[in-house]
Amino acid sequence: MLFEVFGEVLASYIVSSKTKGELAFPVNNAPPDSLVAINCVVLFLRSAIGSCSGAKELIRSSALELSCSSSCGLPATDKPGSFHSGALSKSILSANEAVVSKSSLSFLSSFVDI
């Protein structure tokens, strides 16, 4: 599965399915934006777990910039591999916003054989 590729490096940032949509760490004590961004990407990739190629395409996209609020602001999907295009194009503005930049995606893609 996709998460086996990430291994223990991101294990502490993966949120269980019971708390999907919540950060793995307290917002009041939030870590640097890069860690928040990685957590948001992992949550977003959870919706692509049914399609590894879909997840790789998400990481590969050079124009991708996700905006995550304190709750990551990710839309719920009914089935694996389905994405809401609005999540990729809309900015979610909040005091605890973390933007997944191209450099963050580049770092994340180093864990996936693309």
UniProtKB/Swiss-Prot annotation:
Membrane topology: Peripheral membrane protein
Keywords in alphabetical order: Membrane, Vacuole
Subcellular location: Vacuole membrane
Main location: membrane
Keyword Membrane among record annotations: yes
GO biological process: vacuole fusion, non-autophagic
Signal found in the keyword field: no
GO cellular component: fungal-type vacuole membrane
Summary of the function given for this chain in its UniProt record: Required for vacuolar fusion. Involved in the early steps of the fusion pathway.
Protein name: Vacuolar morphogenesis protein 10
Originating species: Saccharomyces cerevisiae (strain ATCC 204508 / S288c) (Baker's yeast)
Annotated gene: VAM10
